[in-house]
Amino acid sequence: MASLFLTIISLLFAAFSSSVVEAAYSNGYTIPKLLPNPIDSCWRRNPYWASNRRALADCAVGFGKSAVGGKYGSIYVVTNPSDDPENPRPGTLRYAVIQSKPLWITFARDMVIVLRNELIMNSYKTIDGRGAKVEIAYGPCITIQHVSHVIIHGISIHDCKPGKSGRVRSSPTHVGSRKGSDGDAIAIFDSSHIWIDHCFFSRCQDGLIDVLHASTAVTISNNYFTQHDKVMLLGHNDNNVEDKIMRVTIAFNHFGPGLIERMPRVRRGYAHVANNRYEKWQMYAIGGSADPTIFSEGNYFVASDDPSKKQVTKRIDSGYDWKRWKWRTSKDVFKNGAYFVPSGYGTVTPLYGRAERFPVSHGSLVPLLTSSAGPLHCYSGRIC
């Protein structure tokens, strides 16, 4: 029965994937009528997206569903790619993200923003790169610390460098002395209701995305990751018991070539890893320590040709305790000898509220579901 089901799924995928993937990569004129990715199907069919950008805030799924970003604020347009960490100018990205009021931040044109120190975000902000090619690169990158309700969509963050010690403004009324940052693309500390969607990540000094210090209610979706060592860290220390509250959804991402480990690496909290594509990790794909709960559902794993690197999972510094950790696989597809080592007993089903739930497809559909991962080519008046 199981083999018959997989055969049917494969035939359906073969029949539809060609035209659908072509549509997804087009210049915005067409899009499949029944786009199965529930986030994209929420907004991408509307050619007038640029007239109602804030509708995107209704489209998240999973634990970060309630992130509203700047939905209830005004539109702010970045016109100036320069940066001053202490006294940012109006028109710059930093001037927008430090404001106390909600803002939906867009970009007047294509730009590469080289930050002079870490970009510290305030609550209720959306960075929306649709309609422009926006890169944050070659300097320190983004810090989300002690805040809530942040959406980052449609930008490229790459080649991030450590931030130096110095004074950095975090609000209109506060400038603080910072000790420096690690060189992550996005570092999330003690924050909640965060959604990172349709971004590109690569080649940073430290991690690409870190979710730390009891951060929770986070969704990381539709992103493209490539050419990096330590990709995604959920909890930075086994002794941080507060990370037990961490709830993170990782869905519809493409973990592409040149990645080594941590897709993600989890401590103590809960990770729902659903409908992601993994290509030839060089150490492991999903790892953890300190008794995290991990539910791998409907993913597509392609192992490297190295016979020593076929296992998807890795328990780190665990002794024999790992056998009771709840790590499960369901509806996953394993290619080129890839395999997942499950453990533990009891349910691992994510405790989503009604609005947070989303359909998770069989792993055989993941190449289709993730075909538009990364920033989209969006033009006003056309379907993205």
Swiss-Prot record:
SMART domains: Amb_all. Keywords: Calcium, Lyase, Metal-binding, Signal. The keyword Phosphoprotein does not apply. Ca(2+) binds at residues 182, 206, 210. Pathway: Glycan metabolism; pectin degradation; 2-dehydro-3-deoxy-D-gluconate from pectin: step 2/5. Gene3D superfamilies: Single-stranded right-handed beta-helix, Pectin lyase-like. Binds 1 Ca(2+) ion. Required for its activity. Pfam families: Pectate_lyase_4. The active site is at residue 262. GO terms for molecular function: metal ion binding; pectate lyase activity. SUPFAM superfamilies: Pectin lyase-like. InterPro entries: AmbAllergen, Pec_lyase, Pectin_lyas_fold, Pectin_lyase_fold/virulence, PEL. Its cofactor is Ca(2+). Residues 1-23 form the signal peptide. The keyword Signal applies. It catalyses: Eliminative cleavage of (1->4)-alpha-D-galacturonan to give oligosaccharides with 4-deoxy-alpha-D-galact-4-enuronosyl groups at their non-reducing ends. Its EC number is 4.2.2.2. Belongs to the polysaccharide lyase 1 family. This is Putative pectate lyase 2.
